[in-house]
Amino acid sequence: EQSEVFFDAIGEEATFKDWSREFRVREPELVDNTLSEPLRECWGAIESAAEGIEDETKRNELMDGARRLRELHGGIKLFLDQEDEDSVYWIEKGGNEGTSLSLNAAPVNVASLLRPILFGPDKSCIATSATLGTGDDQLRYFRERVGAEHVPAVKIGSPFDYQKQMEIYVIKSMPDPRDDDYEKMLIHWIERVLIKTEGKAFVLFTSHRLLRSVAEEMEDFFDEHGWTLLAQGSGMPRQKMVETFREDINSVLFGTDSFWAGVDVPGEALSNVIVTRIPFAVPDHPLTAARLEEIEAEGGNSFMDYSVPEAVIKLRQGVGRLIRSKKDSGMVVILDNRVVTKRYGKTFLAALPNAPVKIVT
């Protein structure tokens, strides 16, 4: 009951904009901390009960529960007090209906935190990933972000022969994503490309709304060809979607953020990755907005110094879904003409795998 009262008060103070799931909290003490004492009483009662239990397993389980309550107590206090001026605080709606609320806090810049922990003079640390770079062999962007400015960087070549295994197509004739006819042309090109590979594709979106709209408009297309459409947000768990995609050889998966990275589908099942839009981070997300503000305050260019490098890394992750072994092959299609029409587009092209690139006009 106390929890409901507390989060009802949080919900009344959070004024979410249309389509937004985040509300940035800029001042401390948004609401009264009515959970402080109930949580304290609860973990105290659990600890007292645990002291009288001889069974070690049961006693440890109770003590672990008490520890989690103490952590919740500390987290709520941290959020409401906002004592760390170098962090950003926000409330986020969760669940399909957006009915659950979570309290969030994160440091705007992690470099000062990680530098002494991982990269100090008496520390030994190796940071490795296939997508740390933004086209810069010295990995300068990553090193500055994590406080490893003075750490040597090594770029190791790929074991894959991208010249033979991958083809990249950039559709220059696509309208700007902000134009009214963008969605219509997006559907046109997705259909055209899917026919070429008979499905077997990941279609990567940056917007849940656009994904749902395109999926709805293309229902007849998929029925006509007898291909299964797996659309994120339809109720199927992520892992189940991936398993179904692997088993259904001509299926097509529409995914957003969580499908740009961390998904492996080697073999013929994935022969085509379609990128609907450059994956720029939403600039009004509280954490992104705070980082952009910090860069501008220090005299930097927030778009080129943060938005572009972050999007380059995510694009590389998305494109990287295609080739997962030396036996894989296929095509990547980018349906965002900004990679060839905007000055910053060359940064994206330079960061892509060394595969043949064809500009479709």
Say what each PLM segment does:
Residues 1-361:
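ASCE RecA-like P-loop NTPase motor cores
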